[in-house]
Amino acid sequence: MTFVTLCRGHNPGMNPLDLPADIGRVLTDPADTAPFLLDWRKRYVGRARAVVQPSHVEEVARLVGWCAEQRVPLVPQGGNTGLTGGSVPDDSGTAVVLSLARMNRIRAIDPINNTLTAEAGVVLATAQSAADAAGRLFPLSLAAQGSCTIGGNLSTNAGGTGVLRYGNARELCLGLEVVTARGEIWHGLRGLRKDNTGYDLRDLFIGSEGTLGVITAATLKLFPKPAAQVTALAALASPHAALKLLELAQSMLGPALTGFELMSQMCLSLVARHFTDCAAPFEAPHPWCVLLESSDSQSEAHATERFDALMEQAFESGLIADALIAQSIAQSRRFWALRENISEAQAAEGKNIKHDISVPISSIGDFVAATDAALARQFPGVRMVVFGHLGDGNLHYNVSPPLGMNEDTFLAMQDDINALVHDAVAANSGSISAEHGIGVLRRNEMLRYKSPVELALMRTIKDAFDPLGIMNPGKLIG
């Protein structure tokens, strides 16, 4: 990692063993700390004086308070599954990594209030299972749900496949428990759906990537479990056709439409190549494919009847060329595996350049067509691996190298490719980060695309919440 950012007044001569007592488990052996210092994509590797794993909020508060007194940088970390380098320290070796992995308790489930209170280190899949056991649904769902954590989901305002119906992490959170940059504990786990008593502090911490404080627990919204779900794959010619299918599906299914995922043929080809249990779904390849899911509150028969009517209308309108409707839970899971394995398949294929962007839904077709053409002109042979949550305007517009090109040669093009893609995003009034966050990877680009007024306001917030600059320095706003 090339960035080094020291907090204000940092004491560089301190020994790691000067850490205070009663802060939880302390790791200093390189073999123990190594997994916490390398990001998921293996692009960023840092050093730290120690990795600390508290098990209670009071231990977090003691550690943060000590870091504030000693001017020691602190890097909060959840499952370390982020894609922008936001959860690992720089290479100065001055920081303490605060791993929340041991704060992994479900504190409460209230089926009447439809809430679940989970500590920051609870794995997302564990929260989903706890809700399911209580007869409820926690709808946040993403490919890394077996290893990402609630704290990380909230710190990056994670999205996932259910945003179309349920919203992103911010919209699923009712309350937070936070340790401030001064080591104080804010007890905000009230679980209220209405609270008009001033500034919404919760919303400031969500999406702040650990730069304002440490989220230690959250009260989350639960929903009734659907009586039935129907999943289908639809083959079509273009993102423009997918947008028309989305409009039709929303008009016929309304809020029952809970998933609408777009995938290019390149995505499906990579998944079939690198996952032997994920065969190509259709006999003949099609340029694009959509994964649709409907959740029904009445019955399986009612859900199937409505979905069949949608598919019939889509065929009659010429929107889709082929379709497969899952006939079992196992087949539905196979359909979802095609979508969820895309990132892993692209990683297995080799280095790639990722873009987590959003544009107005109505602009997606034109954006993809124009950007594909521009990349093909300026970087002949590059392979566009495009997929994402069409229903909320979020695309993972990734680029893989031409076949046979040296990876280092390809990565040398990264700044130019990023500029082309992100300029196109800006021209469409979009965002260069829809759900992955800014971290280190997008920090300089955010400074380029945000207005001076926005940046000044963000810096004012950062200075107010973290006047010493100890919280995850060098990330997000810098």
Regions found by a protein language model. Name each.
Residues 3-65, 82-114, 143, 267-279, ...:
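N-terminal flexible segment immediately upstream of the FAD-binding catalytic core
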Residues 27-34, 220-224, 233-236, 243-413, ...:
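C-terminal substrate-recognition/cap domain of FAD-linked oxidoreductases
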Residues 67, 210, 397, 466:
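Conserved, mostly hydrophobic/aromatic
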Residues 105-259, 471:
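FAD-binding subdomain of flavoenzyme oxidoreductases
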Residues 184, 443-478:
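Activity-critical C-terminal alpha-helical subdomain
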Residues 426-438, 463, 467-471:
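Alpha-helix capping/hinge segments and adjacent helical runs
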